[in-house]
Amino acid sequence: MKHLVITGDRNTGTDHDFTGAFEPESVRYAKHWRSKGDAVDVTRVDLSKHDRERVAQMLTAIRTAAPIDRLAIFSHGWQTGIQLGLSSSSSSARDELAAFATALACASTPELRIALYCCSTGGSDVPNGLGSFADRMRLALVAAGRRDVTIFAHRVAGHTTRNAAVRLFGPGMTGGVDLGTTREARQRLDAQLHAGSDPLRWTLPYLPIDEARAAYP
């Protein structure tokens, strides 16, 4: 498998979000998958640039790494976008998201899976995340030819990799499905994601959705 990891390149203001979370977690992700024999490219986006330039940097990295099977993004996020320049908050932003999806589809394999290690990208005003950034990103990729793509996202704000508010978006779905909806499953999911020796935070985004739901109902 070929992975591409994308992060920002600096802390935001006085926060230690990059050096304290996004950078070390992206390094751990790459180390894990390389230990399994996978190829992993890592790129950093210059956050001093405007949104369109950030997206252009991501596209350059995607084309350089092609063909990719796995895309992992470590950054801030919200219900309608991510820190690295992509948004779904307006018609023009959705057009840009569609253009990004087309380029990603051309530079990826049919096995493409995406992990959004970003806050809130799977959340919306609808309980199943319909209309969220992750949902719109998946639909844009489907329109671009990646009909089987799945996207891992978080419903609410939390740690970039240890947030147990997980929502998965996949083929044939309207919106997404939540993991850990029972108390026992949520506690187990939370414990595993917080355990430094447990690889679940790297493997969960790429499990078949039915398998993930069966393990963490």
Language-model segments: which ranges?
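Extreme N-terminal starter segment of soluble prokaryotic enzymes
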Residues: M1-L4
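Active-site-proximal C-terminal subdomain of hydrolase catalytic domains
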Residues: R113-P217
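Catalytic-core segments of thiol-dependent peptidases
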Residues: T7-V126, I209-Y216
